């Protein structure tokens, strides 16, 4: 049930006091880092949220809070201005016992905090933790109310949180944010219910957290990855400090070496389109993906143990040891029309240099050819480069080299946690429980293990200034203050090189398939390949997948002593149905049509980084008035370089943070403004975040056309041994058609 402060403040005060006095008190099992004491929490689920309107005048473009809502236990309290929130917040602080706290969840803490910061700084900000300036995870006020960001902690939207943890479900649809509402704007009951609904969900989430995260040895983590870290630490048991000390001794002595490896050696998943098939509407495409790609790499391969020690460049790859090297490649040329080396990881190239570099050919952000180019690689990636590229061995120079003590399997405390969750996930799926909360938790933990191994050192230090601004800490000269390298590695308990090697192994497996079957593979995306089915090469690919799977199952049988729940780990799984239509436009940009057994019909899906699912189909219907399923040729022709999604369909928003002094040198100002009903009202404008709808442009920067021309120019001047490869490829396509594009 909800209550408005402006109408029922006396009743609200009585209810809050009554609920707090009756509530159970629970003690956190982990000491507070600042106070060194165990925090006590009032066991009442709580949530906070604001509703805002954009305010545009001749001078200002800002936003205004016209409604706030705060839930506590089974009740929701609301108000129509930040002035009333001030009164409410001051009262609730006064009723919390001095040694207790309220845990309050927020669905977008950075956003809501910025509107309220001028009001919060009247009290002490007793604790705060943030990943970046705009991304606080914890804001604690006066040692009494702990605001916690919930979306990052649980790794899902508020709607999904409601679905997974709460009785109350997110209401479908949104408030019409184009309507300007102010504090005196009458709200319809459905609008009030929308406000009420979100904080109800947050309160129920709080109840779930108290039941599941405040046991004898449990504590609420900051993020989902933090929870995994706790699982691994528990697996270490009494050896935790011993293991942690050893791992920290493996960190590079030289801080610059660590940052060099972190910036240039660590690479993400491999994604891309076969350049000769980019922007082509293709038929009958098969899809296969690795089962739990990263977890399989963690189980199947060996990893660096010990500290990277700088050694002679002559030692690179001289023994069966892990190596890292900075290598300047000479006359580097891809053996196929696929490119695997990212231009962003080239150490000697700036973005500006790339634009005017005639001796380098860029294929959609990746290096296809370069006269000279420098990369930081490990021994696994070097083997992949040798597989995918030709280069002049004699002129290629190893600039620097590091070696590790040995290769070894990942330690038991990692693999035990990973494999326990993988087995649980597989067992639940086999028993038809893949829609359960238990399955989701297990799957998230399996997928999160890789992320935990490649977490960067936390170096930044932030402060909250007198205006409530979260900002980087700076010294007297204005230079940004960061934690020292030696201080930062005190929190390390896993080798950062394990994560770097996991991605190298994952990429190498994909590269192996791409290089062996370059003509029929159309698209690849981290752990999957899309390939044509109408050629002899595709038949050989299917045979190779079958052979690979047999070998993979034999390895699993050996590692897991015949446990059938692990038999498919790392195997390639083929989709049951072909994609009747497919088109690729580069990394993370493709669209396809495929039969879906759940829908019992064909579905059209697009995967475009930064674009909401279903957006392209909505825009197509809006622009053409046609149904996608009935106009496939027109739809796939519509999906092309230069496609624009307008503001109404993109649902993308840009954020502008109103700085201090924005209002003619002041931090706040009173103005008269009209709501959507033309009701005039005097409002106070202060700190705010302005959300502006923006369009989405899908541009490929003319790389497609330029690259084809480059291929033709290179082909005409190629050595004979290279020409043979290209002749085999070119024979598979209608070359004149490519030139016409």
What function would you assign to each model-found segment?
Residues 160-244, 510:
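Acidic, Mg2+-coordinating catalytic module of metal-dependent nucleases/exonucleases
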Residues 56-60, 113-120, 205-206, 231-235, ...:
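A short acidic (Asp/Glu
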Residues 49, 105, 149, 198, ...:
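A residue-level signal for conserved active-site and pocket-lining positions in enzyme catalytic cores
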Residues 74-183, 194-197, 201:
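Conserved DEDDh/DEDDy metal-dependent 3′-5′ exonuclease domain
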Residues 2-104, 115-137, 258, 263-281, ...:
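Conserved RNase H-like, two-metal-ion catalytic cores of nucleic-acid enzymes
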Residues 130, 520-525:
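Short beta-strand
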Residues 210-277, 306, 333-522, 531-741:
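C-terminal, non-catalytic extensions of nucleic-acid polymerases
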Residues 48, 148, 280-294, 442-446:
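Conserved catalytic palm subdomain of right-hand nucleotidyl-transferase polymerases, strongest
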């Amino acid at each position: 049930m909800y209550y408005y402060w402006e109408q029922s403040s006396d009743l609200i005060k009585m209810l809050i006091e009554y609920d707090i006095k009756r509530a159970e008190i629970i003690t956190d099992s982990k000491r507070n880092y600042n106070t060194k004491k165990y925090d006590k929490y009032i066991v009442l689920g709580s949530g906070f949220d604001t509703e805002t309107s954009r305010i545009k005048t001749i001078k200002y473009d800002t936003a205004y809070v016209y409604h706030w809502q705060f839930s506590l236990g089974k009740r929701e309290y609301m108000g129509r201005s930040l002035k009333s929130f001030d009164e409410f917040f001051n009262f609730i602080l006064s009723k919390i016992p001095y040694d207790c706290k309220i845990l309050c969840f927020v669905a977008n803490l950075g956003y809501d905090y910025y509107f309220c910061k001028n009001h919060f700084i009247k009290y002490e900000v007793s604790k705060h933790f943030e990943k970046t300036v705009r991304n606080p995870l914890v804001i604690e006020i006066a040692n009494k109310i702990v605001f916690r960001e919930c979306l990052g902690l649980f790794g899902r939207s508020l709607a999904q949180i409601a679905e997974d943890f709460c009785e109350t479900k997110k209401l479908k649809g949104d408030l019409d944010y184009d309507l300007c509402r102010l504090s005196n704007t009458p709200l319809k009951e459905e609008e009030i219910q929308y406000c009420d609904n979100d904080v109800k969900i947050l309160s129920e989430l709080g109840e779930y957290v108290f039941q599941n995260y405040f046991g004898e040895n449990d504590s609420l983590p900051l993020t989902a990855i933090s929870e995994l870290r706790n699982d691994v630490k528990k697996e270490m048991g009494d050896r935790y400090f011993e293991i942690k000390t050893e791992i920290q001794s493996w960190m590079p002595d030289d801080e610059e070496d660590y940052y060099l490896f972190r910036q240039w050696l660590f690479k993400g998943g491999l994604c891309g389109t076969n350049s000769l098939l980019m922007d082509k509407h293709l038929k009958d495409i098969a899809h296969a993906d690795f089962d739990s790609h990263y977890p399989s790499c963690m189980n199947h391969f060996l990893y660096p143990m010990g500290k990277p020690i700088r050694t002679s460049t002559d030692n690179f790859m001289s023994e069966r040891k892990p190596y890292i090297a900075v290598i300047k490649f000479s006359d580097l040329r891809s053996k196929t029309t696929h490119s695997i080396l990212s231009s962003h990881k080239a150490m000697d190239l700036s973005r500006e240099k790339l634009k005017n570099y005639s001796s380098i050919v860029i294929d959609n952000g990746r290096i296809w050819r370069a006269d000279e180019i420098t990369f930081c690689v490990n021994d696994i990636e070097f083997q992949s480069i040798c597989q995918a590229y030709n280069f002049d061995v004699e002129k290629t120079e190893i600039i620097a080299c590091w070696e590790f003590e040995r290769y070894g399997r990942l330690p038991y405390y990692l693999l035990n946690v990973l494999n326990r969750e993988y087995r649980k996930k597989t067992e639940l799926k086999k028993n038809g429980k893949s829609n359960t909360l238990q399955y989701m938790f297990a799957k998230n933990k399996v997928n999160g293990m890789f992320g935990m191994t490649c977490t960067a050192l936390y170096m930044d230090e932030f402060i909250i200034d007198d205006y409530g601004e979260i900002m980087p800490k700076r010294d007297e000269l204005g230079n940004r203050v960061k934690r020292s390298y030696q201080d930062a590695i005190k929190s390390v308990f896993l080798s950062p090189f394990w994560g770097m090697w996991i991605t190298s192994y994952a990429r190498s497996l994909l590269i192996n398939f791409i290089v062996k079957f370059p003509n029929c593979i159309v698209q690849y995306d981290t752990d999957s390949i899309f390939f044509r089915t109408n050629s002899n090469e595709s038949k050989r690919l299917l045979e190779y997948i079958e052979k690979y799977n047999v070998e993979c199952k034999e390895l699993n049988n050996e590692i897991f002593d015949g446990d059938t729940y692990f038999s498919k780990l790392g195997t390639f799984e083929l989709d049951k149905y072909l994609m009747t239509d497919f088109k690729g436009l580069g990394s993370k940009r493709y669209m396809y049509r495929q039969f879906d057994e759940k829908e019992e019909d064909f579905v059209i899906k697009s995967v475009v980084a930064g674009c909401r699912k279903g957006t392209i189909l909505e825009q197509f219907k809006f622009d053409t008035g046609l149904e996608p399923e009935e106009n496939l040729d027109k739809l796939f022709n519509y999906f092309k370089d230069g496609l624009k999604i307008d503001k109404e369909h993109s649902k993308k928003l840009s954020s502008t943070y109103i700085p201090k002094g924005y209002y003619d040198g002041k931090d706040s100002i009173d103005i008269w403004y009209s709501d959507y009903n033309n009701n005039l009202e005097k409002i106070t404008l202060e700190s705010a975040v302005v959300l502006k709808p923006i369009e989405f442009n899908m541009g490929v920067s003319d790389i497609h056309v330029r690259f084809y021309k480059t291929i033709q120019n290179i082909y005409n001047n190629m050595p004979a041994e290279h020409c043979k490869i290209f002749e085999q490829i070119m024979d598979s396509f209608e070359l004149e058609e490519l030139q016409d594009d």
